[in-house]
Amino acid sequence: MENFQKVEKIGEGTYGVVYKAKNKLTGEVVALKKIRLDTETEGVPSTAIREISLLKELNHPNIVKLLDVIHTENKLYLVFEFLHQDLKKFMDASAVTGIPLPLIKSYLFQLLQGLAFCHSHRVLHRDLKPQNLLINAEGSIKLADFGLARAFGVPVRTYTHEVVTLWYRAPEILLGCKYYSTAVDIWSLGCIFAEMVTRRALFPGDSEIDQLFRIFRTLGTPDEVVWPGVTSMPDYKPSFPKWARQDFSKVVPPLDEDGRSLLSQMLHYDPNKRISAKAALAHPFFQDVTKPVPHLRL
C-alpha cells in the first residue's frame, strides 16, 4: 500500500470507500477500493481472494480493468483503472436536456459488448446500476465491479448502512430463485436503457414487494403462459394482484420501434427467453450505431 498516495475520496461503494490515488512509482492515477468485509476478525476469506484474482484476467475495452489486488493483514484493496464519472452523475447532469439518442445507443452497444465478453467467460455481474457504469471524455463506457458479487455476496445494506438498490434487480431474483443466469444482467441493463431514454428510473421500488409490483404494473403480472414455472418460485404468491401489460409506446415514448423491440426482449419475464448480450448486439436498433463524445462537466 505504501506505493499509493491517496488523492481524494471519490465515493462509497457497496463494499467500502473508494479513493482516487496515485501510484508513486509510475505516476498512474487509479481508483483504490478498500473492501470492508464482515469477517474483519478472521481476515479475508481465501475463496474471495481466488475469485478476485480470476478477475485480473478479464481484459476488455468496456470492462474497468482490475490492475492489482493488495491483501494486507485483514484488509483487501482492489486497484482499478480510474475513470472520471459514473452514468448516474452524468444522467443527473443531463436531466434537463437529456442524453442524445446516438450517445444512448453507443453506450448501450458498448455495455452489451462488455456483458457479452464477461458472460462468455461465465462471469456474472448481478448488481448492475448506473453508479457502476463509468464513462470518460472519449465516449467510452465501462462496467465496474464485475464479479465482486460472487466473491463477496450482494449485501442488503452497504457498509455505511445504505440500502442497496433494488431498482435494477431481475424478477427471478426478487421471486427467490436461487439459481440464476447471465439473464439477470440483461434485465438490469434493460432498466438502465429505459432510464437513459426517459430520464427517470423505470421501476424505482422501495422494498422487494414494491419492486415486484412496479414491474407487474408495467409488464403485467406474469403467469405460466408468459413465464413457465413462475408459480412454483419460492416467493410467488397466488394472491398477487393481476395487472395487465401496458403498451410499450407509453412506457418509453421517445423510443422508436426498433428500440422498443430491443427493450421488450431485454425485459422478457422468462430468463430463458430473455435476449442474450450477443444476440442483442445484432439487433436492428444498432445498425446505425456510432461513437459520439459526451459533454462532460468534470
Curated annotation (Swiss-Prot):
The modification N-acetylmethionine is found at M1. Binds 2 Mg(2+) ions. Keywords: Acetylation, ATP-binding, Cell cycle, Cell division, Cytoplasm, Cytoskeleton, DNA damage, DNA repair, Endosome, Kinase, Magnesium, Meiosis, Metal-binding, Mitosis, Nucleotide-binding, Nucleus, Phosphoprotein, Serine/threonine-protein kinase, Transferase. The active site is at D127. Residues 4-286 form the Protein kinase domain. The modification Phosphotyrosine is found at Y15, Y19. Phosphorylation at Thr-14 or Tyr-15 inactivates the enzyme, while phosphorylation at Thr-160 activates it. Stimulated by MYC. Inactivated by CDKN1A (p21). Its EC number is 2.7.11.22. The modification N6-acetyllysine is found at K6. It is found in: Cytoplasm, Cytoskeleton, Microtubule organizing center, Centrosome; Nucleus, Cajal body; Cytoplasm; Endosome. Gene3D superfamilies: Phosphorylase Kinase, domain 1 (3.30.200.20), Transferase(Phosphotransferase) domain 1 (1.10.510.10). PANTHER family: CELL DIVISION PROTEIN KINASE, CYCLIN-DEPENDENT KINASE 2. Found in a complex with CABLES1, CCNA1 and CCNE1. Interacts with CABLES1. Interacts with UHRF2. Part of a complex consisting of UHRF2, CDK2 and CCNE1. Interacts with the Speedy/Ringo proteins SPDYA and SPDYC. Interaction with SPDYA promotes kinase activation via a conformation change that alleviates obstruction of the substrate-binding cleft by the T-loop. Found in a complex with both SPDYA and CDKN1B/KIP1. Binds to RB1 and CDK7. This is Cyclin-dependent kinase 2.
